[in-house]
């Protein structure tokens, strides 16, 4: 999941990493984690995985959350093992309700009311046609000098360094400066 987010953020540096890591069922397995990544381009990415996050909603998948990235112009998210997701953008920066208030089930609010019609636009994620086998076929060809590696050594090192920062944050409970 972390490598997917980094791949989608070419050129962006991670400024900080925060992680909450739990062992709910098995002490030897991190079966719950929530990771927050802040980038130098003002994007925040959240990755959450939990083997014990249960739902009884029929429309939800057993493993619902995959990842979500948000900035000041929109959000992209992917859910499920057979990932489905969308990009939701704003046509202009959202603002408070001004002098008015919106009534919600929790009471009145000036900030969390529904946006006016036409402000949010939704689009499909770009279609990607690949399979896991492609990676292994590339590895063999690249190892034999027939083509370049799809995953560069520098990309692998960056993900491993990020995983180390995630572990350190999970251990200390503190945000870790990165890159």
What is each PLM-predicted segment?
Residues 33-34, 97, 167-168:
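Short alpha-helix boundary/capping motifs
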Residues 84-132:
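A short, hydrophobic/aromatic-rich structural module that often spans a beta strand
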Residues 2-86, 90-92, 106, 136-145:
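Contiguous beta-strand/loop segments that form the cofactor/metal-binding neighborhood of enzyme cores
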Residues 40, 88, 92-94, 124-128, ...:
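C-terminal helix-rich "cap/oligomerization" subdomain common to oxidoreductases
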Residues 33, 119-121, 147:
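Short amphipathic alpha-helical segments
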């Amino acid at each position: 999941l972390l490598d997917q987010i980094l791949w989608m953020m070419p050129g962006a540096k991670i400024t900080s990493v925060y992680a909450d890591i739990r062992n709910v069922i098995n002490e030897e397995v991190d079966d719950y984690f929530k990771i927050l990544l802040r980038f130098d381009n003002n994007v925040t990415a959240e990755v959450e995985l939990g083997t014990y996050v249960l739902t009884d909603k029929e429309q939800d998948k057993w493993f619902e959350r995959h990842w979500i990235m948000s900035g000041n112009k929109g959000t992209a998210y992917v859910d499920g093992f057979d990932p489905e997701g969308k990009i939701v953008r704003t046509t202009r920066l959202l603002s408070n309700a001004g002098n008015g208030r919106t009534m919600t089930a929790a009471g009145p609010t000036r900030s969390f009311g529904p946006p006016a019609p036409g402000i949010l636009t939704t689009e499909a994620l770009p279609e990607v046609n690949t399979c896991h086998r492609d990676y292994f076929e590339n590895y063999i060809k690249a190892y034999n000098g027939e083509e370049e590696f799809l995953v560069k050594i520098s990309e692998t090192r960056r993900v491993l360094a990020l995983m180390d920062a995630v572990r350190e944050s999970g251990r200390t409970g503190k945000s870790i400066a990165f890159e």
